[in-house]
Each structure stands twice: as structure tokens, then as C-alpha cells.
Design a protein with these regions (language model features):
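Alpha-helical transmembrane signal-anchor/signal-peptide segments
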Residues: 33-50
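Hydrophobic alpha-helical transmembrane signal-anchor segments
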Residues: 6-30, 282-302
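Short, Lys/Arg-enriched, Gly/Pro-containing loop segments at transmembrane-helix junctions
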Residues: 306-313
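Short glycine-rich or small-residue beta-strand-to-loop segments that form or flank ligand, phosphate
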Residues: 56-65, 89-93, 201-202
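Short extracytoplasmic
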Residues: 45-73
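Short, aromatic-rich amphipathic segments at membrane interfaces
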Residues: 245-283
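Membrane-proximal low-complexity regions enriched in glycine and acidic/polar residues
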Residues: 147-236
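Membrane-embedded segments
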Residues: 66-151
Length: 313
């Protein structure tokens, strides 16, 4: 057996090993490969940048655990930006399987901001006291308070009917939030009674929820809307960008990495998150795949020519 035959018949487990190494190494030691920004992603960032303090933002988390690696870093980055800009954030989901994902992402972000606030107080030598709910007593506006600065409505069945209900009233459609507290008593809804009062709505989805939000939400109640989706479905939303029905779009892990880069560059966060690290691994694996395809095809052609066979292209 010739060298070329041996190479072409190599045990595929060696390839699996190379792919595993290409994934694990960048995750353990991020390469920080450059992330190129795209206009659709920048448009969402710029829109949030223009919103004055106290503006109302709704983020709908409409995806299941199968899309979590791509889309969860996206919503965490958006939450960080909204909180850094001191916007009033309402989040919800139309996907039953996404209820826990949205809560987890929101909890992570809120705890990060409030932990940083408490650390700043400790460094200044100032004492602080938490109430029985874990809320810091006497905190200023930089401390995030549930029901005032943010709220999580949770899941409600009905899809388009839920959106139409929100167009009439947030508190009537969701009488209680995800933790069971009455929404009518939450200060965040004092000036945000329905979808018409929104300054921005962003749908992060792995389903057809984006089209539904456009049809029954944006077009009826005239709020600005952006979207985030998995990479495989990003192209289907470009017509909505071209028509102006979407002001911006985050596509897959790349879109999440772009947003992480923008909030870091703007000084809202210290370092890139999971999406940027994931893009390192994804890029290396893609490069490795291309190299393997080129090498194997090259040796295949060499073997054919040495054997005197005609090669068809």
C-alpha cells in the first residue's frame, strides 16, 4: 500500500481527536481572534445608545435549550448594555422551554451588576445592609431593584394572542410576574402600560416568533424592533431589514460575539463573554475542516495520477 493510500485510509478517530483539540484548546485558553462588526448588529447597539435613561425596553426570549449556546450569550450581552444605560427592562418568553433560560440569564446579569455595586461600597469602606429579600437598603439608582429597574414576566401560552394582549395592557395580560408578584404594583409599569409605550423591542428567537412579533406587534403598535436568531436562520430576516421592519439583527454566535465586543469597547463591560470564546473554537474547527478537505483531495488526485487514471473535474 502506497503512502497516499495509507493517508487516505487513516483511522477517522484521529480526525475526531484533532477536532476535539481544536475545540478544547481555544475554550481553555481563548485566542481572542478579531471580531468584525456588521451593520445589522451595530444598528441595535446604536439604537440602545441613543435611548435616554429610563427608556422602556422589552426583550422576548423565544428559544429552547437546543439554541442556548448561540442565543443565551446574546441576551446576556443585551441585558448588560440595557442595565449599563439605566434603561427600564421588561423580559418575557413565548416559548415554554425558554422560561428558565430567560430567568437564568437575567439573574446572572442582575447579580453581576449588584455585586459590583456592593464591591464598590466595600472598597470605599462603606457598610451596607441587605433586607430579607437580599435587596440592599438605601441604595442609589445604580443598584438594580426588581419591579423598578427590571422585571421578568415569564411564559404565557397563546403566542399571537399574548402579543395582542400586551398591545392593550402589560398588567392585564400578565397579572403576575414569574415569581408570582402582582405586576400592577410594580413601578416599572407606571409609564409602560402597553406595547405602544415601548422605546425598543428585541426578540431573540429560534422559531418563527420574529415574524409574529412583526405582524402582530410592531406593525400594529409602531415600536422600534430588533431581532436575534440562530446563524442558520439569519438570512431569512434580511428582507425585514431591507423593508425597515427590523432596525437590526444579531445572527448566531457571531452576532453575540459582535455585541460582546461593542459593549467592551464602549466600556460597559470588562471582558468578552462566552460568545467570543465560542467563536475562537468555531473558527479554528472551520479552518481545520477546510485544511483536511484540501489535503485529502490533493493526495487523492496525486494517487490517481500515479496510478495512471484519468481525473475528472
Amino acid at each position: 500500500m502506497s503512502f497516499y493510500d495509507k493517508l487516505l485510509k487513516i483511522d477517522r478517530r484521529w480526525i475526531y481527536l484533532l477536532v476535539a483539540i481544536a475545540v478544547i484548546v481555544p475554550l481553555l485558553k481563548p485566542l481572542r481572534l478579531p471580531v468584525t462588526l456588521t451593520e445589522p448588529a451595530e444598528n441595535i447597539f446604536k439604537k440602545i445608545e441613543t435611548l435616554p435613561e429610563g427608556s422602556h425596553v422589552l426583550i422576548s426570549v423565544d428559544f429552547a435549550p437546543s439554541s442556548e449556546p448561540e442565543l443565551k450569550p446574546m441576551i446576556v450581552a443585551l441585558y448588560r448594555h440595557c442595565f449599563a444605560k439605566k434603561l427600564k427592562l421588561v423580559t418575557m418568553t413565548l416559548e415554554a422551554a425558554g422560561a428558565a433560560l430567560a430567568e437564568d440569564a437575567l439573574s446572572i446579569t442582575v447579580n453581576e451588576f449588584n455585586a459590583n455595586y456592593r464591591d464598590d461600597l466595600a472598597q470605599k469602606g462603606e457598610e451596607y445592609v441587605l433586607d430579607k429579600y437580599g435587596v440592599l437598603k438605601g441604595a442609589d439608582e445604580d443598584y438594580l431593584v426588581k419591579g423598578e429597574d427590571y422585571t421578568y414576566l415569564g411564559y404565557k401560552a397563546g403566542y399571537a394572542l399574548v402579543v395582542l394582549g400586551l398591545g392593550d395592557s402589560f398588567t392585564n395580560t400578565f397579572s403576575k410576574d414569574y415569581s408570582g408578584e402582582a405586576t400592577s404594583s410594580q413601578p416599572i409599569f407606571k409609564d409602560m402600560k402597553s406595547l405602544s409605550d415601548l422605546d425598543l423591542m428585541i426578540d431573540i428567537a429560534s422559531t418563527a416568533a420574529v415574524e409574529m412579533w412583526i405582524t402582530y406587534g410592531k406593525e400594529r403598535y409602531k415600536f422600534d424592533m430588533g431581532a436575534g436568531c440562530t446563524a442558520v436562520s439569519a438570512t431569512q430576516y434580511y428582507p425585514f431589514l431591507n423593508s425597515g421592519q427590523l432596525l437590526g439583527l444579531l445572527g448566531g454566535l457571531k452576532g453575540a460575539a459582535e455585541y460582546e465586543k461593542m459593549i467592551v469597547d464602549a466600556g460597559y463591560w470588562v471582558k468578552p463573554g462566552l460568545a467570543t470564546t465560542g467563536m475562537d473554537a468555531q473558527s479554528i474547527v472551520h479552518f481545520l475542516t477546510v485544511v483536511i478537505v484540501i489535503i485529502t483531495n490533493f493526495f487523492y488526485l496525486i494517487r490517481k495520477r500515479r496510478a495512471g487514471e484519468k481525473t475528472n473535474f
